């Protein structure tokens, strides 16, 4: 091999192994390639002065308590001696849960199970936090995961160049935007919850506290059973030994497919036409209620004809009742209905129990008016949720461009 060819191959190999992100801010496009090191070499740990036991978490207080739960704040304390203060932001890692948070204000550590980290020089804390969000440690089981986190290889540019700060600022601004939009979503959900409590009678009462003007003289609501609303169907599962029953375009709803949004459309499992023939079909706009298992009480409506598994009882409304009204009535009473299962290893409400549950019900026009009002709020909630999902997807895509993947470069 001649010298020129060898030189060309060397340059090609060097370019292939260079740690350079696919997207760089204009002022850094001609900057040096990034370096890489294990996270353990880039961080130091912070020891709290004390830990607040879970029994001493307050609902209100002067200082936030942070633990390894998914909530940003686990509780509050008034104990200043427990405060962790630092001039730099601090990363919180849930050793069992793998929850990842960044704290920029003083806080107290809750029960054991978190690691408090900060950048020790080559990489800033804010940059490291965003990098760890890009490629997080995923919980495998209930065990400690810090050793896995510590061994992660992190790619980083020179801190003094300002590129780390630029990336962190860009992604943090998206985090702030997502947080602001999430607060709007929470406000909509809170407003809807309060409105539902006003539009339906309290337990033991027959008239709601808030009524639309055209129904204020309509009289008391009647008490009816869920079975009065229409046909109640308990779901079933086609034989899993028959692969020809699965993988079609017909939704097969399980509790895992039901979110806190009103409608279910896409499901993890689908049925073929032949699989659909094996079960009792659930017509579109029916009301689906989980009656077995740990998620008992989840409720939804189906946008199109579907099937459900045996954990779900579905109500196909008759012409005298509104499916939307029943959905909101069951949502409001979900906890009360779930309590019918009592305490047992696998909570269950059978079809007879479920069908016999009594609910206050107005005439059909008022049912529809209530459903339309709350449906409008649900549309706002759905739109806001999609907006947040779009911002999260944008951030994820941006991180894929801003951070080089060490494994890909080294191949």
What are these regions (language model features)?
Residues 245-260:
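Short beta-strand/loop turn elements enriched in aromatics
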Residues 1-8, 39, 91, 97-161, ...:
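Basic, amphipathic alpha-helical recognition segments used for DNA target recognition
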Residues 20-50, 59-71, 211-236, 260:
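Non-catalytic DNA-recognition/assembly elements of restriction-modification systems
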Residues 272-278:
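Short alpha-helix capping/helix-loop boundary micro-motifs
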Residues 1-37, 157-220, 356-411:
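Amphipathic alpha-helical coiled-coil/heptad-repeat segments
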């Amino acid at each position: 091999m001649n010298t020129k060819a060898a030189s060309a191959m060397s340059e090609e190999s060097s370019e292939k192994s260079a740690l350079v992100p696919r997207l760089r801010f204009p002022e850094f496009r001609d900057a040096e390639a990034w370096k890489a090191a294990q996270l353990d070499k880039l961080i130091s740990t912070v020891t709290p002065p004390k830990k607040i036991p879970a029994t001493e978490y307050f609902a209100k207080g002067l200082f936030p308590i942070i633990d390894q739960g998914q909530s940003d704040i686990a509780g509050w304390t008034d104990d200043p001696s427990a405060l962790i203060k630092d001039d730099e932001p601090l990363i919180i890692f849930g050793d069992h849960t793998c929850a990842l948070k960044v704290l920029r204000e003083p806080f107290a550590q809750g029960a054991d199970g978190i690691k408090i980290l900060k950048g020790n020089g080559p990489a800033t804390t804010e940059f490291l936090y965003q990098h760890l969000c890009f490629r997080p440690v995923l919980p495998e089981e209930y065990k400690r995961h810090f050793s896995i986190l510590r061994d992660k290889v992190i790619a980083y540019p020179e801190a003094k160049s300002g590129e780390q700060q630029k990336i962190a600022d860009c992604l943090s601004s998206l985090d702030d935007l997502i947080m602001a939009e999430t607060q709007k979503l929470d406000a909509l959900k809170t407003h809807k919850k309060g409105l539902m409590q006003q539009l339906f009678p309290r337990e033991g009462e027959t008239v709601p506290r808030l009524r639309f003007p055209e129904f204020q003289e309509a009289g008391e609501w009647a008490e009816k059973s869920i079975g009065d609303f229409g046909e109640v169907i308990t779901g079933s599962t086609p034989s899993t030994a028959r692969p020809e029953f699965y993988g079609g375009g017909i939704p097969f709803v399980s509790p895992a497919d039901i979110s806190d949004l009103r409608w279910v459309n896409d499901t993890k499992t689908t049925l073929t036409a032949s699989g659909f023939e094996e079960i009792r079909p659930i017509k579109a706009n029916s009301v689906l209620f989980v009656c077995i298992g740990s998620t008992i009480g989840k409720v939804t409506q189906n946008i199109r004809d579907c099937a459900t598994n045996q954990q779900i009882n579905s109500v196909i409304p008759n012409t005298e009742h509104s499916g939307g009204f029943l959905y909101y009535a069951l949502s409001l009473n979900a906890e009360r209905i779930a309590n019918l299962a009592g305490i047992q290893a696998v909570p269950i409400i059978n079809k007879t129990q479920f069908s016999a549950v009594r609910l206050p019900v107005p005439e059909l026009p008022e049912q529809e008016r209530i459903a339309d009002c709350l449906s409008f709020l649900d549309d706002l909630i759905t739109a806001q949720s999609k907006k947040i999902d779009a911002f999260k997807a944008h951030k994820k895509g941006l991180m894929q461009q801003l951070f080089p993947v060490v494994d890909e470069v080294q191949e």
